Structures are given as C-alpha cells and as structure tokens.
Amino acid sequence: MQLGNNIQTLRKKKGLSQEKLAEKINVTRQTISNWELGETAPNPEQLILLSKQFE
C-alpha cells in the first residue's frame, strides 16, 4: 500500500489527475486507481515511466 500512497501523493504534487497521468504513461485511469489503492502494482517498465513523470 505504501507504493500506492506514494504514487497518489506525487501525482497530486504534480497537479495531475489520474486520467492525465494515465494518458502520459499509456495506461487506463482504472490502472492508476488500482495502483493507488494497492490492488495491483506497476511493472518495472511502468515504474520507470512513472519516475520520469515525477522528476
């Protein structure tokens, strides 16, 4: 769940909606929601894409 909380916190700090972040890394809004809720986790490639958005 910690990873999901971190994704949500960083996303909000960048002023991104779930939809906008999803578009930027080519996943669905539901995928972002699932990550933030800790239901699923990003794969290594997706983690790299996320890290680039949060630089």
PLM feature segments, named:
Residues 15-34, 49:
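Short alpha-helical DNA-recognition segment
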Residues 37:
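Short, conserved catalytic or interaction motifs in soluble domains
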Residues 8, 44-45:
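Short, Lys/Arg-enriched C-terminal cap helix and immediately downstream tail that follows
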Residues 1-13:
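A short, Lys/Arg-rich alpha-helix, primarily the initiator
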Residues 7, 25-27, 54:
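Secretory-pathway ectodomains
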Residues 45-55:
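DNA major-groove recognition helix of helix-turn-helix/homeodomain DNA-binding modules
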